[in-house]
Structures are given as structure tokens and as C-alpha cells.
Amino acid sequence: MIKGIKGGVCAARGFKANGLNAGIKNNTKKDMALVYSEKPCAAAGTFTTNRVKAAPVKWDYKLVHESDYVQAVVVNSGVANAATGEEGMKCCMEMSENMGKALGIPAEAVLVASTGVIGRQLPMDIINAGIAKLPENMAADEEHAALAAQAIMTTDTHSKQVAVRIDIDGVPVTIGGMCKGSGMIHPNMCTMLCFITTDCAIDKNLLQKALSAGIDETFNMISVDGDTSTNDTVLVLANGMAGNKPITEEDENYKKFYDALYYINEELSKLIAGDGEGCTCLFEVRIVNAPVSYTHLRAHETSQD
């Protein structure tokens, strides 16, 4: 049974978060966030299909597929670090290196994400000052999960968080997530960043499979304005601190985890669609007895048009 709980990205054991105003947006709104795990994590990710991919997308794709483990994600809002060329990639490296130093972990264990204005270089002096402050007050509670969720917002009217708990062989396992997205919402996926944390012990390849399998029927099924973003990113970090027997095959326990992760993605997708720029209501269409997935998708596209 999937039980909804509070806590967002801090609901799962061993995860801390923080969000603050570094000054990127030139106002009092929070614009930098950190999600950190006490233990190394298996990581999975899905990314934009736009031909123009922002520097953080390229950076994270490489780390998710090549790093032995991941332990933190640092995010800035206000500037997307998209269409920024080689300088943009250098900024990603600098963010990872400085965040790693501040946390005492390797740069290769730090994922980065950016959202905001396209075509503008990151103000690295401001960002580096924010990076130095983020670990100071990070904590594993609802308040700091909320601060992080607020800090990743751009045109969103409210923050978006979900968390659930399931039972795997008598062991409570938790999954929590936060996301942002309001405009440029169109598969695949939308202008959105999504960060999911779990204390489940699960094989990295199965974690990626569970994420990828659920994305098509959740985030890739929402649309607001038909625009596909340069920065779309969904990341999942699993630190294994629940203490369950590691999930290493597609058995009943994998199915339980998959269903819970799917639920998280589905609920976050609805929050994004409901907060779309110019939207006044959210329609949910249920298609019953569609013979094949193609019919399902065609009906979805028609409903968007």
C-alpha cells in the first residue's frame, strides 16, 4: 500500500536540503537549492529531447551514466545556463567542484541543474557565494525541504512536493520528490526540473529502468504550450539507508518500488499541469480499453490540441 506523507525530498532517510536567496534574481526570492545524502547514492536520470540541450543536461547525463555514485544536487533558478557554449560547461564543472569542496565529497558526485533565462551566462560570483552558504543550515526536515522546493521555482505560482512510504519485506521505504514547471510544458518532458530521493536499496540499472518506464506515462503526457525546453531533467537518488534487502531483479519488490515511483511522478506531473501559465483548471482524461499504446497516445495528442 502506498501511503502519502510529508517531507518532500527530506522524507527519505539520510537526505538533507536547503534553499536560499543568493541574489541571482535580483530580488528577495530564493534562487539556489541543495539536496544532499549522507551516504553515496545510485542515480538515475531522464533528460530533454530538445536538440539544443543546456549545459547542465549534458553534465548530468555524463555523471549519471559514468560516475560510481552521486551524493548531491545543486540547483540555481533565474538563469538556465542554456545556449551558453563551452563557458556554460565550465560553469557546471565549477559548480560541481565548489559544491563538492563545501560538502567534502568528489566533484563527480555532485549533479547540477539550472532553470530560468536562456542565453545568459551564469553569474558565477553570486552562485559560488550561494554554494558556500548552502551547507551551513541544511537539515533533514519538512522546513528545509520546502525551502529547496521554493528555490527552484521560476514562473511557478507555488512549490510542488510529494512523498510516500511503502513496505518492502516488512521494511518501510520512503520516496520523496520536488519539481518546478509552469511554462514551456510539452513532451518530452516539459520545462521542468524534478528531483526525487529514496532510501530504497536498489540496483542502479533497475532504478533507471523504473524511472524511464514511468516517465512516458507521467511527465511526457502533460502539455501546456507546446514548447519543449532545453533544460528538462528528472533525477532520482537512492541511498539504500532504509535497510531493505537490495532489489536486484524485477520481482515483487521491484514492482512495489516501481508503483510508488510512478505515483510520485504522476502526482508531480499533475501539480505542474495544474500550475501551467494561463491555466485555470486541470483536466484529467481517462482512456479505458485502448487496444494499443499508440491509440492511447494519439488520443492524448488530440486532447492537447
What are these regions (language model features)?
Residues M1-F47:
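N-terminal amphipathic/basic leader segments beginning at the initiator methionine
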Residues V35-C92, P187-L207:
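Glycine-rich phosphate/pyrophosphate-binding loop regions near the starts of catalytic domains
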Residues K53-L63, M89-A102, Q208-M221, A260-S269:
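Short, well-ordered amphipathic alpha-helical segments that serve as non-catalytic structural scaffolds
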Residues V73, G78-E86, E108-A129, S223-P246, ...:
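Short, surface-exposed loop/turn segments at secondary-structure boundaries that line and modulate
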Residues A102, A107-D216:
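Glycine-rich, mobile lid/loop segments that gate access to catalytic sites or pores
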Residues I105-L111, A140-A149, V162-A163, F219-N231, ...:
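Flexible, glycine/charged-enriched surface loops at secondary-structure junctions
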Residues I222-S223, M241-E249, N253-A273:
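Glycine- and Gly-Pro-enriched alpha-helical subdomains that act as flexible
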Residues T295-T302:
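Conserved small/polar residues in nucleotide/adenosyl-binding loops
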